[in-house]
């Protein structure tokens, strides 16, 4: 390694067993939610594929206590996610995805900013999603 140490700026540490996070002093956050393979099968290219039982863990609305009032005032939400290593069939481990609705506060959908704290990531995003019904 080159000796570079990444400073996350917040005392949140990913843990592997059980998958999740620990929060340090002055940090708030909810109980971690674990997404299992069975939970996301419908979103996968091959819903019958093999892969890690625990695919990822997520904690939404985390932050420093000193910023809590400001985050709420600005309607900002900070979340953390950790993923299992491996594949889901032929595709990389990933989340099940989601759609952002238009915020009545701002008039636009919620932006997302990603920081990769360790490892490598592929981030796939699409600008628009539409539901199509097929009548048989």
Predicted regions and their residues:
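Long, non-catalytic terminal segments
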Residues: 14-24
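Conserved small/polar residues in nucleotide/adenosyl-binding loops
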Residues: 134-136
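Intrinsic disorder/low-structure terminal segments
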Residues: 3-5, 20, 27
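Intrinsically disordered, low-structural-confidence terminal and linker regions
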Residues: 1-13
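Active-site region of the double-stranded beta-helix
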Residues: 23-132
């Amino acid at each position: 390694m080159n000796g570079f140490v990444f400073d996350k700026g917040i005392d949140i540490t990913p843990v592997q067993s059980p998958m999740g996070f620990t929060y340090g002093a002055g940090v708030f956050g909810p109980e971690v939610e674990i997404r299992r393979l069975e939970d996301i099968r419908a979103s996968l290219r091959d819903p019958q594929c093999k892969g890690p039982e625990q695919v990822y863990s997520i904690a939404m609305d985390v932050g420093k206590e000193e910023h809590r009032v400001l985050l709420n005032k600005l309607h900002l939400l900070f979340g953390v996610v950790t993923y299992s290593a491996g594949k889901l069939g032929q595709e990389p481990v990933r989340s099940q995805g989601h759609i952002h609705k238009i915020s009545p506060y701002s008039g636009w959908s919620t932006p997302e900013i990603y920081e990769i704290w360790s490892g490598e990531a592929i981030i796939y995003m699409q600008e628009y999603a539409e539901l199509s019904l097929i009548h048989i």
